[in-house]
Curated annotation (Swiss-Prot):
Annotated signal peptide: 1-15
Domain Thioredoxin: 28-151
InterPro entries: Thioredoxin-like_sf (IPR036249), Thioredoxin_domain (IPR013766), TPR-like_helical_dom_sf (IPR011990)
CDD domains according to UniProt: ybbN (cd02956)
UniProt keyword annotation of Signal present: yes
GO BP field: cell redox homeostasis; response to stress
Name of protein: Uncharacterized protein Rv1324
An example Gene Ontology molecular-function term: oxidoreductase activity
Key words, A-Z: Signal
Origin: domain of life: Bacteria
Amino acid sequence: MTRPRPPLGPAMAGAVDLSGIKQRAQQNAAASTDADRALSTPSGVTEITEANFEDEVIVRSDEVPVVVLLWSPRSEVCVDLLDTLSGLAAAAKGKWSLASVNVDVAPRVAQIFGVQAVPTVVALAAGQPISSFQGLQPADQLSRWVDSLLSATAGKLKGAASSEESTEVDPAVAQARQQLEDGDFVAARKSYQAILDANPGSVEAKAAIRQIEFLIRATAQRPDAVSVADSLSDDIDAAFAAADVQVLNQDVSAAFERLIALVRRTSGEERTRVRTRLIELFELFDPADPEVVAGRRNLANALY
């Protein structure tokens, strides 16, 4: 999920027009042999040039999410980010593809993305950007970001060819999805927990449980939670309830600012408690969401 509205919406939609490139790539792909396809998609990091951009980014993103890192070896931050993403890609074993664009070597590819600074990371699915961020991110946050990409695109792409994975949706997963869609949060939580118990690496189950737990809590809050919290400015529980309702109503920035203001007014265990809840709310969203980025920055300012 990330929001009660669709998660990982096209954060860069309209910023990069890849439709023409995608059309040409599909035409080229139709003329390629299976052997050529295998040779052009090695495991690990794929170095992108003008020559392979269409195949390895646009066409490949019809199969699995493609994370494009635009970087320069002259920057230590870029090198660190490449190392972290490379490790995540290796661990994913083909569930997503990491494409590396050295902007010093392939400046015209960088221009396609309108890069203003490096490192810049853009995730694509079905030939279109779906999320992006600039700068170095903590490893745990990058891992959650990748998880959110996989969750948001689950069942929507062709998938990489694999003898280990079936194209059919697991009946247990289908049931859990339907329960969540029907608003039966308790049943969906139980179903997803069973999936996670059987498969501890399930990206979808982890994300769904986190989201469902929020929805169960938020929908149980009193309707006037915001006005109550406004009248009790230092009541932590009231602030938590109000923030839940605000997030549920998609007034996300206001929810974040409410708790950040409380961080500024508290100390010790109380401050830790508020900070922990705020981070939990951040984790409901795409880490590259502008409201999350601003919220994390404001929280850091409030703490330090």
